[in-house]
Amino acid sequence: MYGIKIYNTLTRKIEEFKPVSPGFVKMYVCGPTVYDYNHIGHGRVYVVYDALKRYLALRGYHVLHVMNITDIDDKIINRAHQEKRDWREIAETYTRDYLESLGKLNVKVDLHPRVTEHIKEIIEFIQILIDKGYAYVAPSGSVYFEVDKYPEYGELSGRTNKELWSQEKEFISEKKKPYDFALWKAWKPGEPHWDAPWGKGRPGWHIECSVMSSRYLGRQFDIHGGGTDLIFPHHENERAQSEAAFGVKPWVKYWVHTGMVMMGSEKMSKSLGNIIPLREAFKEWGPETLRLWYLTSHYRRPLVFTEESIRQAQKYYERLVSVTNTIKKLSREAVSLHRMNDEDLKILEKLLEIRSRFHEALSNDFNTPQALAVISEFMTLVFKEIQYNPKYMLVLTAYKLLREFNTVLGVLDKYLVETPEELETLLDNVINIVVDIRRELRERKLYDLADRIRSELGKHGIILMDRGKETTWMRRK
């Protein structure tokens, strides 16, 4: 099996993937600020890291996937003022929309920490930075990270010129340098606040992710994800404050970023007013089509929205459903057993080669468009050859391969859930295959192997009865 390689934004290289703890992957992805409905740009982030998690699990890793919910922020407060509603009501409304969107996209996140549930930990983290000399309290009661104290600042984003670091310009008058950033924002009348040793206020944006990721994944973890628009300043600031607080380098082993969803030449964003809400996209095209569409472009590249690209994803999904139904039908109808001839073996070799190339694509920096192209070859093979030569071994191999593909794609779950009757038929088919192979072993006088098969099946309640060259079987009641 191919070793997994992935692009690391920090080093600008594709690197061999080796988690901090062998066999266990800890992954943090920046989640939404819940002040509005999710749009299809958000959906790409959700699906890409879910599919990456699924592939790592397929390769035998245990993956802990954490994605935060920012439920207190300037945007939430502003929305609450505009609508004359409580900020908590705003956050809860759009949190529900976010979680419903994940469900429809078949995205499974292990933990969803919320900022408001971690205020105590945030205050403690800021105090550590103050005590270590990396942060200072301004006269207003706001707390800022002193960027010049962290020499590696700018490495993640590639911004070596300090003139490109300026941020949070509305606070520039009380900061030591224009590029220092807020860890704690002093309270203003009409805003929510919490008490802290340096004065009441609320957390800055960047500190939240550092605290919640380390709370659940420890002081060093494997993958930190998000869109490329978060590299600066958000992820640059996270890295600086976390390595300063923990004294651990690297804080994150692999920085993995997804490209933006584009509307023509512009990034899809609420500020530009060119968004398509996910809830509308679900009605128009369906979540399965959207999920596949997100995977048609390499995760690091921009994904340009066009009606035609969505239609192509829809056709691909319809073909996947068709091939699934065809394979299930063949598994029920192909009742006769025959020895594999040379032509059968060639088809089997093609199936195994397709599986190998599927893993080759995903192992090489998670190349989903290449993996989808390989799956297209699989579908053609089923429709043009296996459909007209439904030998059990070929049909069973194709079925297992389809399930493996769907482990990552996640769009065929409702078609691959077997009823008890289908499971019974599948089990009977597998036993018949094993019995047929055992008969050939007996004909070749490989009695030790034949006896071993009889013994192993017997342990599972399957009794074989030989009568001359023929074998029948029954289940022990």
Curated annotation (Swiss-Prot):
Entry GO terms, CC = cytoplasm
Annotated binding of Zn(2+), by residue? 30, 209, 234, 238
Where does this protein hold ATP?
Answer: 270
Q: Which organism is it from?
A: Staphylothermus marinus (strain ATCC 43588 / DSM 3639 / JCM 9404 / F1)
Q: Which reaction does it catalyse?
A: tRNA(Cys) + L-cysteine + ATP = L-cysteinyl-tRNA(Cys) + AMP + diphosphate
Subcellular location, record wording: Cytoplasm
Q: What class of enzyme is it?
A: ligase
Which HAMAP family does the record match to this protein?
Answer: Cys_tRNA_synth (MF_00041)
**UniProt keyword ATP-binding present:** yes
Query: Which gene is this protein's source?
Result: cysS
Q: Which InterPro entries does its entry note? A: Cys-tRNA-ligase, Cys-tRNA-synt_Ia_DALR, Cys-tRNA/MSH_ligase, CysS_C, Rossmann-like_a/b/a_fold, tRNA-synt_1_cat_dom, tRNAsynth_Ia_anticodon-bd
Q: Where is this motif: 'KMSKS' region?
A: 267-271
What biological processes does GO assign it? cysteinyl-tRNA aminoacylation
Task: State if DNA-binding is listed as a keyword.
Answer: no
Q: Provide the family line.
A: Belongs to the class-I aminoacyl-tRNA synthetase family.
Q: Which NCBIfam families match?
A: cysS (TIGR00435)
* Cofactor(s) demanded: Zn(2+)
Q: Per the Swiss-Prot or TrEMBL record, what residue ranges does the short sequence motif 'HIGH' region cover?
A: 32-42
Protein's UniProt name: Cysteine--tRNA ligase
Q: Name one GO molecular function term.
A: zinc ion binding
